Amino acid sequence: MIFKQLIELYDLLDSPSASGAQVVDYLRSIDPACDAETYVLEGPKGSTDMVRVRIPGSRGRTAGGDAPTIGLLGRLGGLGARPERIGFVSDGDGALCALACAAKLLSMHARGDVLPGDVFVSTHVCPHAPTFPHEPVAFMGSPGPRPR
């Protein structure tokens, strides 16, 4: 089950100071050798921390094999819309689920349960996403650049 990882990451992400660095530190507490990185992506309405994790497979490209690679993308506007909306908001579920999957796969990998193919997980951590007016509730935006 993935409940432990969901609860731990929810606790980590439900904070106005949540960051990509905190997420990477959490993932490295599970597997110190994990391939995880974070970087800041600046946009017209602020910034967000991008997080990328690679879990190598036993026969994946990382190991020189031919097993298929899968990518999990946690899409969202942001974890929070502070100060307009206090606390973790529903747009954060994409990041939470993607990162919980990464944490579970890293835990399995560290214990010897290795999937055949590589798994990539990517999302962003933004506790202060911009909003724009909409009734009855404002819509979430994203500080990053718009997709082309």
At which residue positions do the language-model features occur?
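Acidic, glycine-rich active-site loops and adjacent beta-strand->loop/helix elements
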Residues: 76-79, 123-130
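A glycine-rich helix N-cap at a beta->alpha junction
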Residues: 136-148
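Short acidic, glycine/serine/threonine-rich loops at helix termini
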Residues: 84, 130-137
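Alpha-helical metal-binding/catalytic segments enriched in His/Glu/Asp
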Residues: 72, 82-123
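Solvent-exposed alpha-helices and their adjacent loops that cap or buttress functional pockets
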Residues: 44-45, 59-66, 89-91, 111-115, ...
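Hydrophobic, Leu/Ile/Phe/Ala-enriched alpha-helical segments that form helix-helix packing faces
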Residues: 23-31, 101-109, 147-148
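Generic structural signal for well-ordered, non-membrane alpha-helical segments
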Residues: 16-23, 91-95, 144
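Soluble metallo-hydrolase cores and metallopeptidase-like ectodomains found primarily
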Residues: 4-82
